[in-house]
Structures are given as structure tokens and as C-alpha cells.
Amino acid sequence: MISTLALFTLASVVFASPARRCTGTISSLDDVSSAVECTTININSFTVPAGETFSISAPAGATVNVLGNVTFGYKAWAGPLFELSGTGITFNGNGYTFNGQGDQYWDGLGSSGSTKPHPMMKISSSGTFTNLIVKNSPQQCFSFGNDATLMVSKVTVDNSDGNSANGLSNGKPAGHNTDGFDVSVSDLTIEDSTVINQDDCLAINKGSNIVFQRNSCTSGHGISIGSITSDVTVSNVQILDNTVKNNAQGFRIKTDASATGSTVSGIYYSGNTATGCTDYGVIIDQSYPSTLGKAGTGVTISNVTFAGTNTVSVASGADEVEVNCGSGACTGTWNWSGLKVSGGSAGSINYSGITGFTI
């Protein structure tokens, strides 16, 4: 027979609350451990000490409110600078700024130069993440590790200062490898956001059920699938109603020439506009890290669609469209009837399965 004490103990375990209905306030890293015991977490303005991660492991269903600007101290180290985890989290940036002080790190070399903390923002929560300005990420800005649905909206990645040279960059733009959103997860939507940077606005390396819509990408490398390495899958990706301005390319799929066992499928573009592309309007290239070199055959690409209206204009000297598929690696019919390109040179296409579009 189970004793009364045992039953009481069991009930205490079963009905214990995972977090207190209280408000925790963070004004320094010393406040974090007590604040994350509460279901409402408020972040005031403060400076994160150099070489430390501002890490919030929030209880399920918690709300995190940013109520002031946060600056991250300068130090050459691996990072990340900020980390958020938890299930069903509501993160409200309220228009405040997280400043990574990338201008103190930038040397025009990105990952090939001095050590820079990256990613700046490691988001492993599910739920919503909205209305935050992230300024001057030292290197890559956002990476995601959500294991359930995450909606990101009204986020600004402002690395515009990196477009100018500084004393370390030998006349080149100081920012480099400053990707906006690096994605290797599923069930992610990014919408109504702005990226000004010097690398990919969006880079999808693996994952499925990904939506990127109504975003603005300026001065970087455009919207990219890849680079795709071995034994990964990218599927069901929707690129909708985005504006790409003055990027190296508008829309790109790139796979490693040496990669094997990977698939890219169900990539759907609609309602996008790209202007001022300096290298390529649309490029699908299976020769990475070369550009338009000998294409590999170990990644299968299928069902790439341009629907509705996608308008792409390139600068003089740039190519409108380049498709460089490995032998037999691109499969099926790709309907590109929704793609309109202009400016520069026509480019070349080595895959016969594209319909509704010719160069």
C-alpha cells in the first residue's frame, strides 16, 4: 500500500509549477539566474562584459521584454554574444538595440582575419521573436536552433557601417562574413525584417518548412540556399515578396562540388524584386567553392519554381541567369514562367528541364 506521505510527495512532483508567475528584471548578468525563474523577464539597458555570453534559458511560455539598449563589450573570442532558449517563448525587442560593436572587430577579412564572436545571436527558442534592432554584428548575426515552430518578425540587422573601409581593412569594406540569418533548422518563418550587410541576407544550409517573406536585403550577397554540404536535406522553402537591393546576386542556390547524399527540393519564389545585382541575378551553381567551375553530381536539385512575378535587374557587366548543374544532378521540370530579368549579359543555362523561361 502506498503511504499518505508517498502520495503527497508524488502529488507535489506532478503539480509543481515549472516557473513562478513573477517578473524578473535583468540589469546585469548577475541578475539572470533569478530572473529566469519567472514567466516575465524584463531586460534593462546595460553592457555585457567582454568575453561573456548573455544567455537566457527561459521557462516554457515565458515572455521576454527588452526595455533598453544592450551593448556587448569588445574582446577577441569565439562567442556567441547572446543566447536564448526555451519553448513557446514570446520575445519582444520593443524597437531597442543589441549592439555587438562589430566596428571594433572588422578588418575586411571576416572569418579569415582576427577572431570574432559568432554568431552574435544564437536563438534556440520556439515561439515568436520580434521587433529588435541588431547593430554591428562582429561576424554572422543570427543562427537558429529551434526544435519547434519559430516566427521571427520586424527584426533589423544593421551592419551598414561595415560597407565603409576602416584602418584595418586596406581600403576594402570593413565588414565581411556578416550573414544576416543562417538557417539549419525546420519550421521557421522570417518576415517583415531588414538586413543591411556584407554577406548573405539569408543562407539556408539545411531544413524544411521555411518561409522568408516581405523582407528587405541591401548591400550583401542576396538570398541563398547553401552552400549545401554532404548528407543534408533542404525542402519546402518559400521565398515570397522580398526586396533585394544592390547585392552581389539576387537569388542563389549553391552546392559543394564534393558533396554527396544531399537533396534540395521544393524551392518556391514568388513576388520578389531584385535590383542592382552586381554579379548575377539568379545563379544555381554546383561547383562551390568555385564559381561556375566543374559541377559536382552528389546533390540532387529538383522542383525549383519562379511563380507569380519575380523581377530581377542586374548591373552592366553582370549576368542575368547562370545555371551550372552537374550531370544528372538537376531533375524534373522547373517552371520559371514567373521570372523576368533585364540588364547586363544573358548568362547561360545547362539544364534543359526549365520551362517558361529562356535567356
Predicted regions and their residues:
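Fungal secretory targeting signals
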Residues: 1-21
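Right-handed parallel beta-helix/beta-solenoid
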Residues: 15-34
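Sequence contexts marking disulfide-bonded cysteines in secreted/extracellular proteins
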Residues: 21-23, 37-39, 324-331
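Extracellular beta-strand-rich solenoid/capping regions of secreted or surface-exposed proteins
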Residues: 28-36, 48-63, 71-90, 101-126, ...
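Right-handed parallel beta-helix
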Residues: 63, 87-97, 125-136, 148-170, ...
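Acidic/polar low-complexity surface segments
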Residues: 69-81, 93-119, 153-180, 220-230, ...
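C-terminal hydrophobic structural anchor segments
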Residues: 277, 287-337
